[in-house]
Every structure is written in structure tokens, then in C-alpha cells.
Amino acid sequence: MQVNFDETCDSVIRMNANEQTRSANGIGNGNGESIPGIPDDLRCKRSDGKQWRCTAMSMADKTVCEKHYIQAKKRAANSAFRANQKKAKRRSSLGETDTYSEGKMDDFELPVTSIDHYNNGLASASKSNGRLEKRHNKSLMRYSPETPMMRSFSPRVAVDLNDDLGRDVVMFEEGYRSYRTPPSVAVMDPTRNRSHQSTSPMEYSAASTDVSAESLGEICHQCQRKDRERIISCLKCNQRAFCHNCLSARYSEISLEEVEKVCPACRGLCDCKSCLRSDNTIKVRIREIPVLDKLQYLYRLLSAVLPVIKQIHLEQCMEVELEKRLREVEIDLVRARLKADEQMCCNVCRIPVVDYYRHCPNCSYDLCLRCCQDLREESSVTISGTNQNVQDRKGAPKLKLNFSYKFPEWEANGDGSIPCPPKEYGGCGSHSLNLARIFKMNWVAKLVKNAEEIVSGCKLSDLLNPDMCDSRFCKFAEREESGDNYVYSPSLETIKTDGVAKFEQQWAEGRLVTVKMVLDDSSCSRWDPETIWRDIDELSDEKLREHDPFLKAINCLDGLEVDVRLGEFTRAYKDGKNQETGLPLLWKLKDWPSPSASEEFIFYQRPEFIRSFPFLEYIHPRLGLLNVAAKLPHYSLQNDSGPKIYVSCGTYQEISAGDSLTGIHYNMRDMVYLLVHTSEETTFERVRKTKPVPEEPDQKMSENESLLSPEQKLRDGELHDLSLGEASMEKNEPELALTVNPENLTENGDNMESSCTSSCAGGAQWDVFRRQDVPKLSGYLQRTFQKPDNIQTDFVSRPLYEGLFLNEHHKRQLRDEFGVEPWTFEQHRGEAIFIPAGCPFQITNLQSNIQVALDFLCPESVGESARLAEEIRCLPNDHEAKLQILEIGKISLYAASSAIKEVQKLVLDPKFGAELGFEDSNLTKAVSHNLDEATKRPQQNSCT
């Protein structure tokens, strides 16, 4: 049983009422003393293990009385504080488990977790990278990526879980306790109950070990001092208090009377470290979004994920119908018993299973539904009475695995059942695989039904097409007869007035967006490699600290991996020259900082950094209302999901052997890259002197030439100059610079904001391709970088996933022969680049720079992400793209569940009725009617 916060509060309230009633009637005092007449099964089970046992009545739904329950929680909190006091700064998981959406912990959507996970006495907390050691069930194939797990449980306090009291305490904490926030920085949500917060095991004052000191109004929330003369407590949250000195110095515009009603923290104005690390400001900002806007966000999200969950439901229905026909009886599908940090993958394609799958009870071989469909098609098996083509998307060719090549002896049975593969293929050869499931039987069907009811009852107005002559749009391409040469490029200040409407419209059409002046020069100065290393080093264990450590780096001149000292790399980052040869040292750090260290550094040392990002509704990893990927519960494994820091050396001087570059990336996630630091602190004129790029014959590469990465080609001297040179600049007129028509500038004289040029030197050059150009681009790469015929692969190979790089000759050839031209522009310090999912891009580092990247998933990108998931499924199993695949099916299910409950909460809540009715009465009426219909209508079986 998992007890959540609300149920616990209700139990405490009921218990207090019962205790008062018993005291009034003379039954007992509730303090563990004599209470005669209580049945043994209702008594508190607290004892000394010998003779004594507490005689008080146990709490409702608990095995102990209120006194011993609170004592146990305080003991666990103090134990957790002592155990983690020295290591709190090293926790890589920051933030709170609670999000704005309360729909992420459905009782019917949780995976089945066996209590055997805890029944070994003490919860084993292995200190491998600060993560709880995963125990794998041999009967299930688990997904074990090479990258560190980003979502996982933190090590728990050692509690004897065979004891009823210990089990109650641990399961109580599992229901609400943060898995990301270290004890030293956690701040509870102000909307939570005060009595519950006062004994929270995750909250304590920095000035005292008393976890409830601040909630009692003894300590100033801002300065953490309790020796102030006047401290004003907040009546809204009953938790925080501010001293008069801090209020007059930081919040002088708020009167003391207003502070007493609503404190700065509840207003989202507090800038202390605790509030920044707990995203309190962002929570308040999201909470204050108008209800109608929230509903529109949720409808957009539901409309985007509905096709995906309907596809999942249709595939499940087909398999259920087949299973009923094979068994000729009503079926009750076996549900897999997965632990919270486990993931089941298909034995063939290695893709995580969403819900239904086929399982061998003898050898535990697992097969996803898509592989079942591919095997039946390869075996030419026709299943009568079912819709076999539900997986086909209109207008898109179906991608499937080549089973006949990889498993020539494995075929589907004539009745449509799937036999277990022979032993040489990893199976046991049994006659049939049984249908099994992970979630509850009707969960997906209910989601589809409710989502359709809501979406069909609402219609959002179409966005107006923006004026491309607006000064906020910059010309990044010279395509003929094309309306998307201009890119939306506002400044951060402009976004505050424009809102997200224009961004939404651009994103829906798959166009990139750039945002200028996200960070100022003073903020960027704190992002140099030495400062990053110093801050990360402060979070590491003293025993593991190293003054000048070795780092892994890629030498862009030859593509080889080298070990360099931090000091040596820092010198190369600043001046970039080899003192012996005089050539630039073009190094890119590899996996430094690590994903976990990057997340820890950004959320702990730079808590204000995320808050400075634009479009937080889209990109925030936990609180973004429009970030579909943020709807996953915290216990789900999702790889490669944290912020990443990329440190590279670059130079404006062109090198004949190569350049500092990043090959073509083709992501199923939306990405944002923020250039936080460059080695050039002064403005200078860009001069790049290069030899003319020699003309290359227009012909295919030799059939014996393999598909090499740019680094490998550099090693063999096969790749020509990879950056813009004088010859190419003269030929490609006009230059693709950031320019706008002066006539379109705003009349207020704000030319600095509206101009697309920048006085500082560009740190990186970007080439971003449109989604509609992907087929032509893929064809060109397949023709130019062709694999030899003697190399065969088990699955489909896509050149866009191979990290190739297009130099100026390739881009010119691509434009002349295929009519494909990317958006080409320079990124300046403090500028953010938003790349939609499915838009290939490549980067050339024009000088040493540091990029911070965040991934997210907008509703407008869900369809493209689902399409790319099908492509990635057909890649070889050891391909990097497959190891980092986004579980778009599972994400869509959880997002739909979360959105449905949020809509119900907003629409049916009486306090929002007036606001919704005043804004749009028809919208409110339609949604309420559809929700009532969905609630009253009896839920049918998922596939009948």
C-alpha cells in the first residue's frame, strides 16, 4: 500500500478527532498510557520486544498510535539529516517530486511493485554514483544504458521493514518525499499542510537541526537568522517568516501588512538559495497562469498525444482479439511485476515495452507488439477478423525489421500465434508466446475515451500568421520561392511582451527559433572552464578531489581521443595554440562534465540559470505545462534527459586539416542550446584566411569507401575545409549573415534589440535543415557517403544518424542538385537556439565556447517524435541513437492521464467557475458536459 500526502493528513485529522472524543469520555489520553477495553488488534504495536507494549489505540490505517508515529518520523528525519549532512551538496538529484500537475501518481497506472524489494531487513543503499543499486530480475530483460540513470530513488535511511512501524514510515515517505532534493536545500510547497511540514524528513533550517524551526516563525527565511528583533510570519503558508531588515532591504515595495498576508516566497519573489533550488519562483509563476490559458495548454497537449495513445490502443485490441480466438475463453492477462527503477525491453529490437507484449513462461523471452506484427508479415500470415493495418500511418511508409535475414528459421504460426524462437536465437522453441501486460487492463482504453471526450468538445482558434517583415524575424536562408527564409529571433525582453503565441506558431510549423540576450555579459563571465571545475569540485567528495585532473578530449585535427590535464585544456581554451607547432589546439571535452555532474552543478550552483530561460512553459524539466516529457513520474527511467554542458576549443583561423565541429544531429527531442561563454571577450573583425576549396568531381564515392565520420576522414586527410572561407564566401553571395531590412526596424529607436547582427564575435556557426528537406538530405548522404556492398547490416541504416558533416562543397552541391539549403547563422554569446525535433543540424565552433543544452518535448513535436521512434527502432541494437531513444508511447500515456485530471480539476472546481464563465461560457459548458458524460458512461473492457 502506498500512502500519499492527502490520505495521511486525513488520517491525522480523523485521529485527532477520535482522541478528543475518547479524552472527553474518559477512555484514555492518547499518550501511550492505559486505555482499557481496546481490542488487541486495534492497539498500538509499539513494544520493547519483550513484555511492554503500548496500550494506546492505533491510528486509522496505521499500526501505531499517533505519538509513536510522530516519534518515528522525527527519528527518521534526524537520522536522515545526520547521515546526509556532509554529503548533501553531492546529491545530483535536486528539486521536488511534486509538480504542478497532480496527475502523475495514479493508483491504476503504477507498475506493480513487490514488497520483496524491501523484505531483506535493511534497504540496501549502494553508493554507486549516489544511486540506489538496481536489482535485476533474471526473468526479465532490462534496459541498461551506458549513461548514468537520471531518474532514480535516492538511498533511504536504514529502517527495519519487517517491523510494522518501519514499514509504515517508509511507505509514508515514499508517497510524498522528494527524490531529488538534498536535505540542506529543500523547501516544502507553501500549499501543503503546516502540521505535516513541521515533521517533514526533508526540511530543516540551515541554522538549526530542528526540522520545524522555520515553520514556528523563529528564523528568518531569507537570512536564516533568529536573533532579529522583529520577525513577521506569513499567514498564507503558515511556514515562512521574514525579518524586518530583509524586508526593508530586499522587498521594500511590499508593506509589512501585505507581507503578513502573503510573504515574498508565496508571491514567487524570494531569491534565496532555497527558493531558487526548489523552483519556488517558477511554481508561483505557473500557479498564477490564468485558468483559461491552462486549459488551452492542456487541450493542446491532449490533442497532440491522442493519436499516439489511440495507436497503442488499436494495437492492443488486435492482440487481445487474437488471444481470445486462440484460447477460446475469456482471458486475464498476466501482469508483469516490475520494480520502480526497472524497464522491460523487447529481446529483438531492444526497445522498451510500453504496455502489452508477448512473453514465454518457460524461458522469459519477451517480444513487443511491433515485432509480432513484423514477424507475421515476414511469414505471410493473415489474421482474419482483425485489422492488421492499424499500425500503418496514412501517407507514410511502414518501417519494419528484416526478420527473414536475422531469424531465417523463425516464423509465425498459421493461426497468428508467435512461437518462442529456437535456442540459437535466444528462445526455447515453445509453441506460443502468451500475451501479458504492464499496466492495468483498462487504463489505456479509459485514457482514449476521456481524451476523445475532452478534445471533441473543444476547439482552439487558429493562430494568425506572423508578418515576416517584422523586425523580430531575421533572414537566415536564400531559398527561392520559400516563405520560411526568415526565423523568429526576438530578445528576452521582447518575449515578455509577446508571450508564447509566436513561438507556438513557429514551432507548429517546425521552424527553429533564436532568442537573443538571454544572459548578459556579467552572467556569462561565470561560465569559464575554471569556474565550472571549481564549483563542481566543491560538490565532490574531498577524498576524490584532484587539483589538476586528466580529462578525456577529442582532438579535432585527427579525430583521436586524448588525455589532457585540466590546466592544459584551459590554456588551449584561452589562446588555442600549440607552442611547438603554432597550430591551434582544437579539443572537445568528452563526457565532461558528466550528465549527473552537469545536473548537480546547474541546479545547485546555478539555481537561477533555469529561471532565466525563455519559454519555461515548454522547457522546464519538471514544471513545464507544455513539456510532454515532464509528465513522466519520477520513478520512470528515461535516459539522456538532464542538462548537458559542452566545452569546445575553436578558432576563426581556418585549418587545412580540419575544424572544431559537431556532426549532423538528428534528434527525436526538441533541443535548446544556450551559448554561455566564449573565449573572446572583446569585439574584433572576423577574418578567416583559407586556401580555396578545390572542386571535387560530381560523382559517387568509391564503392569500397566506408561510411566514415568526419574525425576518421580528417585522420586520413580525406575531408577538405569544413568552414566558410573566402572562396566560398565570394561564390555564395550574398553572405548568410544575420540581417534585416532597415525599413522594418521599429520606430522607437531600439535598433540594438531589433537588429539581427551583433557587435561581438560569433561563437558558433549553425546549419539547421527543415523537416521537409530530410528525405532529400538523406538521399544525398546515402549517395555521397555510401556504404560498400560487402557490408551488410541486420536492420535499416540511416545516414542521418551517423554523425556526418557537410562542408561548403557538400552544401553547395546539395543546394544546386537537390534544392536543399539550411538556415545558416552565427550564434553569439548569451543567445539561445531552439531546434524542433526532426530538424537535422550541425555546428562549427568559430572560437572556444561552452554550450548548455536542455531537451524537452512540445505537443507540436509529439507526432514527429513518434515517427522518428519507428526509424530508430530499425537501427542496429548497438546504435547510440537506440540506446538513447525517447519512450514516446509511455510519455504520451502519462501525459494524457495528467492532462485529463488537470482539466477535471480546473473545470469542476467551483472557485474557477466564475473565471471560466466570464471568459468563455461555451467552452466551460462544453467541457463540463463532456466530462459528465465520460464520468456517467460505464467503462467497457479495453478491447470489446
From Swiss-Prot:
Q: Is Cytoplasm tagged as a keyword? A: no
Source organism: Arabidopsis thaliana
Q: Name one GO cellular component term.
A: nucleus
Q: Where is the composition biased (Basic and acidic residues)?
A: 685-703
The misc remark on file is: Misses iron Fe(2+)-binding sites required for demethylase activity.
Q: Which SMART domains match?
A: JmjC
| Name of the featured protein | E3 ubiquitin-protein ligase JMJ24
Using the record's annotation, list all stretches that form the JmjC domain. 621-873
Record-annotated WRC domain positions: 38-83
Residues given in the record as Zn(2+) 1 binding sites: 220, 223, 243, 246
UniProt gene name: JMJ24
Any one GO BP annotation for this protein: heterochromatin formation
Question: What cystine pairs are annotated?
Answer: none
